[in-house]
Design a protein with these regions (language model features):
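Nucleotide-activated sugar donor-binding and catalytic core shared by glycosyltransferases
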Residues: 1-184
């Protein structure tokens, strides 16, 4: 497990707001008690958790730290909410934002309002989910296509007479492509 500095503070805030809450670490040792909220205080489980939620808030995006990757909850076809600090995934964010597949909030109050609205208006949430799934479908295989294109470009570059003395990079790209495809 990782050391999450604010875990107990967040647990306290949730309880103060009237929610029953537990942590992922506690659930490893105790049976769940139908808690309203489970706080993740472990590493490597966020992707699995996205699959069971209805609405996903992408953390890190309410502060100038930069948000997490939208593609993780999108892979599960979720309604996504982000803060305004998505500069580290600006192209991906723009794609989802321009197609109304994610909502952007400025602060915690707006976040609460939008989460509530998505549950009060399930048809809006379902439209967002459909658009998210469409974006994922349309972009499936993009990494492989990019690697193939890069391989072709490098091959053409290295085949030109003025560049024949350079070390061939295309074998490295082929190796990378094989490795990367194994990951996705």
């Amino acid at each position: 497990t990782r050391r999450v500095l604010r875990t107990m503070e967040v647990v306290h805030l949730c309880r103060k707001a009237g929610f029953s809450v537990t942590t992922r670490t506690k659930l490893q040792n105790e049976a769940p008690q139908d808690e309203d909220i489970v706080i993740l205080d472990t590493i490597g489980e966020l992707g699995k958790i996205y699959s069971i939620g209805d609405v996903v808030f992408v953390g890190g995006s309410l502060v100038p730290h930069g948000g997490h990757n939208i593609l993780e909850p999108a892979a599960h076809g979720k309604a996504i909410i982000v803060g305004s600090h998505m500069f580290n995934f600006k192209d991906t964010y723009a794609l989802f934002k321009n197609r109304d597949a994610c909502l952007t909030v400025k602060n915690g109050a707006e976040l609460a309002t939008e989460v509530t609205r998505l549950f009060d208006e399930p048809e809006h949430r379902h439209r967002m989910e459909e658009e998210t799934r469409a974006i994922v479908r349309e972009n499936k295989g993009a990494s492989r296509k990019s690697a193939v294109l890069l391989h072709q470009m490098l091959d053409a570059y290295e085949s030109s007479p003025e560049n024949r003395h350079h070390v061939r990079s295309t074998q490295k790209i082929t190796n990378f492509q094989t490795y990367f495809i194994d990951l996705v």
